[in-house]
Amino acid sequence: MKNIFKLTALAVFLCCLVSCDDDEPIIPTLEVTPANLNGTWELSEWNGTPLAEGTYCYVVFNRKEQTFEMYQKFDSMYARYITGSFSIKNDPYLGAVISGEYDFGNGEWNNKYIVTDLMESGSMIWTAKDNENDVNKYIRCEKVPENIIAEGSYEKSVIYWK
């Protein structure tokens, strides 16, 4: 009788293990390193919404120097070309956190960002460390469009002449 009870308990336990299956597939992500960020990225969504027409942000990361070039048009009627350096730190609770500093003594980025879902297919999510509602989705692209480089270069030359 004891053996039947043990076998029944074992059979129930094994059935429970077999029935426990995660229906969602695990999508592999890349480790957040300067090498995996290297290249050109376009901001495609801000807080789940596509960018308004006429606004853009392209970031070009250089893994060797850990520098960035940014072409953006958000808070001004003119495009801006911004340069600086970045660093990635691994927080044991949050994961990879990216931060940056602008060149020419213009200070640090307003936020540090938790980088998640860095996909081999070419997308990643940045969430502001101090504001979980500030979420940015970047997609990898081949290069910054020439007209945007020209627009950013024009603004750069205007700034230096002022």
Residue ranges and their predicted role:
Residues 39-67, 101-109:
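Short, solvent-exposed loop/hinge segments that bridge or flank secondary-structure elements
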